[in-house]
């Protein structure tokens, strides 16, 4: 189920279970995982498959393996806050994922996270090819970190 309110999302979470975040792109998905205490967000991996059934199966495997209790999906909106074509694509993906899992899904504003992730990797001296392979997972960890920071105050 897609939850629009962060407090409601938090209320539905199981104590001491991790969250995952997804940075959904047209060519790849970045995945990040929190620790059980939800104090740290870590890039997990990048899914390069574009077939939605395979992507959802991969996500279900991650959810089962790490005993995840909630999912955060980065919602790409433009700088003015307007909905874009990519926003609609991500919302449709979130709806499809919600049909496959019985976990709360929260959509988090992800403006500029992939660019920030790429800049962060660049500042560490990561080569362009490696940045492009990892920036979505790092962006997902930034999205997750934003939510983790917000729920500390709930």
From Swiss-Prot:
Q: Which UniProt keywords apply?
A: Cytoplasm, Hydrolase, Nuclease, Ribosome biogenesis
Molecular-function GO terms, alphabetical = nuclease activity
Q: What is its EC number?
A: 3.1.-.-
**Has the keyword Nuclease been applied to this entry?**
yes
**Annotated CDD domains:** YqgF
InterPro entries assigned to the protein according to its UniProt record, in alphabetical order: RNaseH-like_sf, YqgF, YqgF/RNaseH-like_dom, YqgF/RNaseH-like_dom_sf
Q: What are the recorded Gene Ontology BP terms?
A: rRNA 5'-end processing
> GO CC annotations?
cytosol
Q: Does the keyword Cell division apply?
A: no
Indicate where this protein resides in the cell: Cytoplasm
**Where is it mostly found?**
cytoplasm
Q: Name one Pfam family in it.
A: RuvX
Function summary: Could be a nuclease involved in processing of the 5'-end of pre-16S rRNA.
Which PANTHER family does the entry link to?
Answer: POLYNUCLEOTIDYL TRANSFERASE, RIBONUCLEASE H-LIKE SUPERFAMILY PROTEIN
Q: Which family does it belong to?
A: Belongs to the YqgF nuclease family.
Q: Report the protein name in the record.
A: Putative pre-16S rRNA nuclease
Q: Tell me the organism.
A: Rickettsia peacockii (strain Rustic)
